[in-house]
Swiss-Prot record:
It is a peripheral membrane protein. Residues 124-127 are annotated as: G4. Residues 206-283 form the KH type-2 domain. The lineage of its organism: Bacteria, Pseudomonadati, Pseudomonadota, Gammaproteobacteria, Pasteurellales. Monomer. This is GTPase Era. It comes from Glaesserella parasuis serovar 5 (strain SH0165) (Haemophilus parasuis). Belongs to the TRAFAC class TrmE-Era-EngA-EngB-Septin-like GTPase superfamily. Era GTPase family. Residues 15-22 are annotated as: G1. One of its GO terms (molecular function) is GTP binding. An essential GTPase that binds both GDP and GTP, with rapid nucleotide exchange. Plays a role in 16S rRNA processing and 30S ribosomal subunit biogenesis and possibly also in cell cycle regulation and energy metabolism. It is found in: Cytoplasm; Cell inner membrane. The gene is era. Its main location: cytoplasm. InterPro entries: G_ERA_dom, GTP-bd, GTPase_Era-like, KH_dom-like_a/b, KH_dom_type_2, KH_sf_prok-type, P-loop_NTPase, Small_GTP-bd. GO terms for cellular component: cytosol; plasma membrane.
Length: 300
């Protein structure tokens, strides 16, 4: 009796900010592990999304959006994390938005020229293209810029052609051992996922009011004697005025954020959650490498 062959590969999902990389990953996995919002650079960390079906294991690396401006330390770190992912994988999915092509897209493409991994171009949000006849000449122009292995128009939000993209990825996997147990969907801890859920709710309920330099630190994550997860989250902002915005009038804003975050955590963790949130001013944290290291933005 012979052992069944197994196939495995690492696939980086790259692109400029806000083109739908995290939405695509969540759609492929069939569940939410990477937060999404309309705000650019929602993803700040490299996150692995793992899908195992039978002999095949796809390990997707969701990266922060690559962009030209690097004004603050946190922006430089996110660019570094995204760029380093390109050199460590077996395949790259380059996500762009419809018929738009920006300087940031061009910068990402130039970084891909040094990779030996095959690159799939995923043209996302095709359902938003009003003039459909513009798509074909755009695809032709992009195909002349780079030797893409495949060009696939998709809608990550609606799921259009995502199965075609994933089928191409799976058929390209090389023989190899699985790196994670079959029930794993991410390499990130529950503590990390809790902080990301809170950050997503901040973005959703504050919109344009939300300062870019806001982050979340989980100060406590423990199970009490009743089996409930007790989670304490600290929201860090840079100015006193930002703290007041997050708390809201009579604490209403932070109450809504906490209620929605707790509901999402209970669904994700399949466990009852007691969540407490505080807001603290920490001036200059997004430019302080020691602070960024303690918050998990810099790998040791």
């Amino acid at each position: 009796m012979t052992d069944q062959k197994t196939y495995c590969g690492f696939i980086a999902i790259v692109g400029r900010p806000n083109v739908g990389k995290s939405t695509l990953l969540n759609k492929i996995l069939g569940q939410k592990i990477s937060i999404t919002s309309r705000k650019a650079q929602t993803t700040r960390h490299r996150i692995l999304g793992i899908k195992t079906e039978g002999a095949y294991q796809e390990i997707y690396v969701d990266t922060p959006g690559l962009h030209i401006e690097e004004k603050r330390a946190i922006n430089r770190l996110m660019n570094r994390a995204a760029a380093s992912a390109i050199g460590d994988v077996d395949m790259v999915i380059f996500v762009v938005e419809g018929t738009k092509w920006t300087d940031d897209d061009e910068m990402v493409l130039n970084k891909l020229r040094s990779t030996k991994a095959p690159v799939i171009l995923a043209i996302n949000k095709v359902d938003n293209i009003k003039e459909k006849e513009e798509l074909l000449p755009h695809l032709t122009a992009l195909s002349q810029k780079f030797p893409f292995k495949e060009i696939i128009p998709i809608s990550a939000q609606r799921g259009k052609n995502v199965h075609i993209l994933e089928k191409f990825v799976r058929e390209s996997l090389k023989e190899g051992i699985h790196h994670y147990p079959e029930d794993y969907v991410t390499d990130r801890s529950q503590r990390f996922m809790a902080s990301e859920i809170i950050r997503e709710k901040l973005m959703r309920f504050m919109g344009e009011e939300l300062p870019y330099s806001v982050t979340v630190e989980i100060e406590q994550f423990k199970t009490n004697e009743r089996g409930t997860y007790e989670i304490n989250g600290l929201i860090l902002v840079e100015r006193e005025g930002q703290k007041k915005m997050v708390i809201g009038n009579k604490g209403q804003k932070i109450k809504v954020i906490g209620t929605e975050a707790r509901a999402d955590m209970e669904r994700l963790f399949d466990n009852k959650v007691h969540l407490e949130l505080w807001v603290k001013v920490k001036a200059g944290w997004a430019d302080d490498e020691r602070a960024l290291r303690s918050l998990g933005y810099i790998d040791e």
